[in-house]
Design a protein with these regions (language model features):
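Non-transmembrane, aqueous-exposed alpha-helical and coiled segments at domain scale
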Residues: 1-425
Length: 425
């Protein structure tokens, strides 16, 4: 059975913890899109980890972790991430890398950095991990597929062709040093030697695994509002963040995805620029930010303070809908225990009209939040294991959110640890 775990909002919802928890009963965990531009934070018996390329199931010895064809594969980064786990006492995970994945090159990071600097105040808030240049090259058909690393003649011809194109931009747009094709070839061969032990036809491997009835998790990165088609364009990432893309990015039939667990945060947070209707500021924001997450709301990749706001039911309902949600994991609920009352955004006012539908970006930028307030529970809920043992106002908050987002909440996370979870269904 194949289950996808995805985010409903901007990312940072707590997908890593939910994947880590569900991986216990899984055989295979797959990253199917994105790259090292966003981190999944996990706290377990080995310590606290921020994974960027590895799937969040790597801490279980019985699992196989797959880097799918849809991933932006930074090979040195992946190897470093594997080695850092082993250095901290984690048994070396079993990793497979799709021979159809494409390689994120050092020049992708350079171009990302140069473009953000060129755009200055109009930049997209990139993590400067090379993601947009990587996917641009992939769809312009000038990327390097992992399988191509093992054909030196092809690499050489392609490296010279790519450098010819890139150097025009470097010389005339960015005014930066030119690429040396021989250095690019050396880097590609170095990457080949590092990745060779892990490479296989992962689509064929998954085909057999599905026939055998093995349990498979697709782990998404970021969330619905960062999708390039359905998100807050252009303040989006460069690969699809939807569960539907899991079939493409992993190389399996779409009808095999039976369950879609969408992770929804009990309040809102985002890294980077773009419209954020329920955002709060000042001391109010600082307190929520410092109490939030698993040690404060700061980006796992950049360390930047996350923007924070109240729960946005309009955005979350939309995010769940476009994911095709079958169940919701509701996270970081414990953070809100300090509040006397909890505002929730239930609508947007745009040009004097109130809507419950999530609009396109030009309208979203004019939206003002329509808030309702629920009573807080004013206590620490960590350690509670049964839903009925939660404070009444806490249960009312969960049930209000469930009604607003129109999707069943099956799991409630009430702490940062793997076992801090309440199963409702």
């Amino acid at each position: 059975m194949v289950r996808a775990i995805v985010g409903a909002n901007w990312g940072d919802e707590g997908k890593g913890k939910i994947t880590d928890m569900l991986a216990k009963a899984s055989d295979i965990i797959i990253r199917f899109q994105g790259g090292s531009n966003a981190g999944h934070t996990i706290i377990n018996d080995y310590g606290k980890f921020a994974l960027h390329l590895l799937p969040s199931g790597v801490f279980y010895q019985h699992t196989t972790s797959i880097i799918g064809n849809g991933v932006a594969l930074n090979i040195p980064y992946l190897i470093q991430e594997i080695e850092s786990l082993v250095e901290r006492g984690v048994p070396k995970p079993r990793i497979l890398v799709s021979d159809r994945a494409q390689v994120l090159m050092p020049y992708h990071v350079l171009f990302d950095t140069y473009e953000e600097a060129r755009l200055a105040g109009k930049s997209f808030g990139s993590t400067k991990s090379g993601i947009a240049p990587f996917y641009s090259d992939k769809y312009a058909k000038i990327g390097f597929q992992v399988s191509e690393l093992f054909d030196e003649d092809l690499l050489r011809e392609k490296a010279y062709r790519v450098c010819e194109l890139k150097n025009v931009l470097l010389e005339h747009l960015y005014h930066k040093p030119l690429l040396d094709p021989e250095e690019i070839i050396k880097e590609l061969l170095r990457c080949r030697d590092m990745i060779a032990p892990y490479v296989c036809d992962t689509s064929a491997y998954l085909h057999e695994a599905i026939k055998e009835g093995r349990n498979i998790l697709l782990e998404g990165q970021l969330g619905s509002l960062k999708d390039p088609d359905h998100g807050i364009y252009p303040m989006v990432t460069s690969s699809s963040t939807l569960a539907a893309y899991g079939a493409i990015g992993a190389g399996i039939p779409p009808y095999e995805i039976k369950d879609i667990t969408t992770v929804v945060k009990a309040y809102s947070s985002a890294v980077g620029a773009g419209a954020f209707v329920s955002e709060i500021f000042g001391d109010e924001a600082d307190e929520l930010r410092n109490r939030g997450g698993d040690g404060g709301e700061y980006g796992a990749t950049t360390g930047r303070p996350r923007r924070v706001g109240w729960f946005d039911a309009v955005a979350a309902r939309y995010g769940c809908r476009i994911q095709g949600t079958t169940e919701v994991a509701f996270t970081v609920l414990d953070v809100l225990g300090y509040l006397d009352e909890i505002p929730v955004c239930v609508g947007y006012e745009i040009d004097g009209q109130v809507t419950r539908e999530f609009p396109t970006t030009s309208k979203l930028e004019k939206a003002r939040p329509v808030l309702t307030r629920l009573p807080g529970w004013k206590c620490d809920i960590r350690g509670i294991k049964r839903y009925q043992d939660l404070p009444e106002n806490c249960r009312k908050y969960i049930e209000f959110v469930e009604k607003e987002i129109e999707a069943p909440i099956s799991m409630v996370s009430n702490g940062p640890g793997r076992d801090d979870i309440i199963m409702r269904r």
